[in-house]
Amino acid sequence: MKKIITFLYLLILAYACYDDKGNYDYREINQISIQNIDSLVLCDQMDLLSIPVTLEGTQYSDSNRFTYMWEVNQKVVATTKDLNVYANFPLGINTARFVVTDKELGTKAFKNFRINVSSSTAGDGILVLSKYQGHAELSFKRLDREGSTFTPNYYEALTGNRLGTNPRKIHRCYIPEAANVNSGLKIETDHRLKCLSEETLVEIGENKYLDHNFFISRAMTLPPDITEFDVKACWHLTTSATTTSLGGYIFVIANDELWHDQRMAMPAYNVDLNMTFMQKASPWHGQLSPVMFLASLTGSGTQNYSSPELLYLFDESEGQFIYANVNSSAANRACSELGIYAGYSLLYGTHTASPNQAVAVLGNGSVYRMLYLKLPSKTSEAAAVPFTVLADVIVPGEVINSGTSYYPMKNESYMFFATDNGLYRYNLRDLENGNAPGSQNRIMTLTDFGYNADDKITCMTVSRTEQEILLGISRYGEDTEGMGEELKGDVLVLDLKTMNMIRKYEGVAGYPVDLMVKYQKFLRDGKENGVDVSDVLYF
């Protein structure tokens, strides 16, 4: 009975406390509801993700009275009311949260949701390799959808890791490997070849680098112990990539030696062969320039190239050209007939539209020479096509120097090259008459497109249809490290024939060192059947 009385007393007391508001100053708290965020948001990786938010408060909803925080995978990605960020998130489902905090009261409102990220990188796109705040970065823009935007500096944001510190080149392999030992993209950085997927633009599993182990695993003989693999240059050459035939080469200059691998496959017949050769040094075992080139690269059928045989290099220690037979283990040989260029390095070399005629650019830091060479492309041609220097001209340093980028036309005698703030178009036939490239060959300057005189073209590429030229432009002045927060690397897309501007992308990268139109499928000239252009690219 005593327990019952005590219980009733406590019940009456609780009711009295609840009903009696006394003399306290009660104030209703502003309650915020968050509108316009779906529970599941769909987006493509690296695309701009925009979520405009509407706030509704029981007393006020003035946006200035709140602070905001967007979290994805427990990481803060924005502190603005509306979300506008590049979707540098892993593929698949990502957990997300939007937090609104009342500045005066400190109360919070939450909205939990998920972001389902799909791949936007599997198709055609532009890749820019740059140096930003002293380290390597990649930027990307898809070309398979109209109105898409650049995703600047996506790599570290997506992976949480640095790409490297000394970026040089982007390389593309079109020959798939079952074990991903030779991924579709190679990023040349820190004297190594970092392997990335051509679809996700990040690493595939544990496949991080292509090094001497790749060649050793495919070779028929084992080399002595190798403690380092110091890469100077790389070149992927695809000769065939059809449904019935796959063929291509990878050439690497590392440790001042040539390493190369040829792969030939016919998937329908379960045929997959390779020839791998390693450690082919100069006859003098000197220092090799980071450049290699062919005497000829001729088309075969509607999509293929004929397989090459002789690859040309330059020994800086001896100042002489040498050649390697890429189809045998034979030692590299000297091209003494081409002369000695003591103190020079080979800055650039290429075959041209004319078979057995190549161009080489040499430099010693103050003098730059352009050579027009007649060279055999096969050992069987050596007697009929002797090693010959057709022309040797001095080129002004303001026209060609160590920072010049080049592109030879596939079927014409013209070469485009970019130096500092100018783009040049030069007829290689002029070399035969001893006429060096000069200011008369300049067809545009950056000032034509609103740039300052100290802005520079730092790299360039041409679409495979040769309809567009893409220029990587630095607005960093003399800063080649891309320091500071502001991105000052641009991409300018021009019509190759008219030089009219197609698009200008500002602030999409750090200091650009290389750019590439990343095609998902190999088409030699962008023509599906060898006749009709099939590329549809939304620059």
Give residue ranges: language-model regions.
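Short coil/turn segments that connect the beta-strands within blades of beta-propeller domains
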Residues: 123-125, 182-183, 246-248, 355-357, ...
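Repeat-based blade/solenoid architectures
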Residues: 162-168, 343-344, 394-401, 449-459, ...
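Sec-dependent signal peptide recognition
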Residues: 2-10
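Beta-propeller domains
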Residues: 130-216
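Preference for solvent-exposed, low-hydrophobicity sequence contexts
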Residues: 180-405, 426
